[in-house]
Regions:
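N-terminal, positively charged nucleic-acid-binding surface of large information/translation enzymes
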Residues: 10-15, 19-107, 491, 495
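Alpha-helical recognition segments enriched in aromatics with Gly/Pro capping
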Residues: 1-34, 49, 99, 120-342
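Structural preference for alpha-helix termini/caps and helix-kink/transition segments
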Residues: 270, 277-499
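Short phosphate-binding/catalytic loops that engage adenosine nucleotides
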Residues: 60, 134, 484
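Short, glycine/charge-rich beta-strand/loop segments that flank catalytic centers
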Residues: 68-73, 94-97, 107-122, 140-149
């Protein structure tokens, strides 16, 4: 295995070397389930899904843990706004999140722990920190003492002496007064008797956000993780605080490698509800194929920002997303190529000597090498484009008059598609089904009725049978004017929407 990844802790691209050479323990911070998954979530979990797929394709056993934060102040706030019980709201959005991840083609993690089922583990870790003088109780809250951990700031490269109070604490002098140092953070938060919370050794309350991930990750993966991942926004304070409390408790390195993906931006601004440029994955599912969203997330390096453009009508309504639409065209091309390969007549595939086209023969290896190099998905997609071009040329050769395709080349092309599915998680669906969905969605977007188009094609077929070629041409031209391209073949007439 020759995987090299950028380690946020060192700022260097390094060989990925799990503690056990054949087993990688991977933890990724999951969502706080108070709303639907947004495009930032989509990007994050596609990135780590590709990572896990690639490590497994390289022969590693991977234990992949991705949590669900179903206890958090944001959930409590949203529940109050909507008049919903917090546990009910969290469960609903957790289920929706899982559905969205499946639609994006992400594999289930091996373990998906929830905070609500790990409270005893959280209690034990907090008590361990209190007993070790790394945490203290203050009026029912429990805080981690950052001054007790000499390496605080090593991930984010921040100096403790320069850290200031957060905005919420500048407004809450009572909370600030409970702390020994302004940067101390809550491990346990006191709550009123009638508020959402749990009984603990320190009174009724709720766990702090940071301690949740430490407790869950160490419960399922041990004291030292091989890789901890998440979005760039989690470097500080979340991951910095995870390191502090975990290493203070165990005396061991918390993670061997830290990996962070970049933001999703719209018109070069970070997505924000206040700016009106905030989109959930579900906002896009009706506009483009979910696999196109997955593909689009791979078009820039995972550490760089993914900047999306949008188109608006005169009233300011969103009418399109050019990058996702282009990604859908590329996904359609992929499936059309796969469909052509699968549909080659057996009599056209023969045993002949000769070299296999290099972009077919070398595709699986080129794909692996691209992902070995800090998960370089844009390069992997460039290799895919070369592969698809070569496969189409192979199919063209086979379908010429008296044309043939070498069986070895066809088999290696089929192996290339299997590698694509295993490594990138694209090309996994039935070509017939996904192309039909894309076609019908494009027709609907143009205000066209698929059933009406089918009727017109049927009328044209009858006209051709009756040798009324003028009528057949009229129907063809009428459909062409609407952007409908007819595909005449030995098994009848199909259709597609022209780009």
């Amino acid at each position: 295995m020759n995987v090299r990844l950028h380690n946020t802790l060192t700022g260097q691209k390094e060989p990925f070397e799990p503690a056990e050479p054949d087993h990688a323990r991977v933890y990724v911070c999951g969502p706080t389930v108070y709303d639907y998954a947004h495009l930032g979530h989509a990007r994050c979990y596609v990135v780590y899904d590709v990572l896990v797929r690639h490590l497994r394709a390289d022969g590693l056993k991977v234990t992949y843990v991705r949590n669900v934060t179903d206890v958090d102040d944001k959930i409590l706030k949203r529940a109050a706004e909507t008049g919903t019980e917090p546990t009910v709201l969290a469960a609903r959005f957790a289920d929706a999140y899982s559905e969205d991840m499946h639609r994006l083609g992400n594999l289930d993690p091996d373990v998906e722990p929830r905070v609500s089922t790990h409270l005893e583990d959280i209690f034990a870790l907090v008590q361990r920190l209190v007993d070790g003088d790394h945490a203290y109780v203050s009026d029912g809250d429990v805080y981690f003492s950052v001054e007790s951990f000499s390496d605080y700031g090593k991930l984010s490269h921040r100096d403790l002496g320069q850290m200031k109070l957060g905005a919420s604490e500048r407004l809450d002098e009572t909370k600030a007064a409970r702390k020994r140092h302004p940067a101390d953070f809550a491990l346990w938060k006191k709550s009123e008797e009638d508020a959402w919370g749990w009984d603990s050794p320190w009174g009724r309350g709720r766990p702090g956000w940071h301690i949740e991930c430490s407790a869950m990750s160490m419960k399922h993966l041990g004291d030292t993780l091989d890789l901890h991942g998440g979005g760039l926004d989690l470097v500080f304070p979340h991951h910095e605080n995870e390191i502090a409390q975990s290493e203070a408790a165990t005396g061991k390195p918390f993670a061997r490698c830290w990996m962070h993906n970049g933001f999703v931006e719209v018109d070069k601004e970070k997505m924000s509800k206040s700016l009106g440029n905030f989109f959930t994955a579900r906002d896009l599912f009706d506009r483009v194929e979910p696999e196109a969203i997955r593909y689009c997330m791979m078009t820039v390096h995972y550490r760089a920002p993914l900047n999306l453009d949008w188109t608006l009508d005169d009233a300011g309504n969103v009418t399109g997303f050019p990058q996702f639409e282009e990604a859908e065209r590329r996904v359609a091309y992929l499936y059309k190529t796969k469909q052509r390969l699968e549909g080659l007549p057996p009599k056209r595939v023969v045993d002949v000597d000769g070299p296999v086209p290099p972009d077919i023969a070398g595709f699986a290896e080129a794909l692996r090498e691209s992902l070995d190099d800090d998960l370089n998905m844009p390069v992997a997609l460039a290799k895919l484009a070369d592969f698809l071009k070569a496969v189409n040329e192979l199919c063209d050769q086979a379908m010429r008059k008296k044309g043939k395709a070498a069986r070895r080349a066809v088999e290696q092309a089929q192996a290339g598609f299997r590698a694509l599915e295993a490594e990138l998680g694209i090309g996994t669906e039935s070509a017939d089904i996904i192309l039909l969905r894309i076609r019908d969605r494009r027709a609907k977007a143009r205000g066209l009725d698929s059933a009406a188009i089918e009727r017109q094609i049927s009328d044209r077929t009858e006209a051709r049978k009756s040798k009324d070629f003028a009528e057949a041409d009229r129907v063809r031209d009428e459909l062409a004017a609407q952007g409908v391209e007819l595909l005449d073949g030995p098994e009848g007439t199909g259709w597609t929407i022209a780009d």
